[in-house]
Amino acid sequence: MTADLPATVIGCSNLIVRGGRYLLVQESKEPARSLFNLPAGKPELGETLAEAAVREAREETGLDVQVEYLVAIYHCPRTSEGVGVVNFVFRSTVAGGMLRTSTEHPAVGYFSREEIAELGRAGRLRGVHVELAVDQCAAGTRLPMGTVQLIACAPSPSPAGSQREQG
């Protein structure tokens, strides 16, 4: 772990399917330059995982999506960048917007499972999670949205004995 990075990063990815094809975006920044990935990113403070997935889809593809269900949760204890990743993959449907490219994602498009497998064999996917998620989605894997529970985070109570002594 480096001083700039947390030990584990949370990611939220979208599986957006049209006609049996899966939407991928091409990355433009190192260390993933030119690699294809699911539309994905990190939640901002105060944002739920599903809200982060919706925002990231809009930012990366121009599409407004609605999260349907959770397909998978992947944990990579250590990436090549020296951090751990826990990635929540959601099946999302297009609710509006127009598909577009951006500076960060110079190519976006729908790919068949076979094309995604070819990208994987050629080392052109961001990670093995892309193929795994596509295969799990195609197999009909659905995790209940309640798998991830939203909780209120209150300050921890004062430890015993930390109160001032009367005297």
What role is predicted for each listed range?
Residues 9, 17, 38, 65, ...:
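Short connector loops at helix/strand junctions that flank enzyme active sites
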Residues 64-72:
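A short coil-to-beta-strand element that immediately follows conserved catalytic motifs
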Residues 75-98, 109, 115, 134-137:
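Active-site-adjacent beta-strand/loop module that shapes the phosphate/pyrophosphate-binding cleft
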Residues 4-8, 35, 80-86, 102-105:
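A generic structural micro-feature
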Residues 1-23, 74:
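Conserved N-terminal beta-strand and adjoining loop/helix that marks the start
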Residues 14, 70, 90-92:
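A structural signal for short, well-ordered beta-strand segments
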Residues 18-59, 167:
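Conserved Nudix-box catalytic region and its N-terminal flanking loop in Nudix hydrolases
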Residues 31, 104-167:
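Nudix hydrolase/Nudix homology domain
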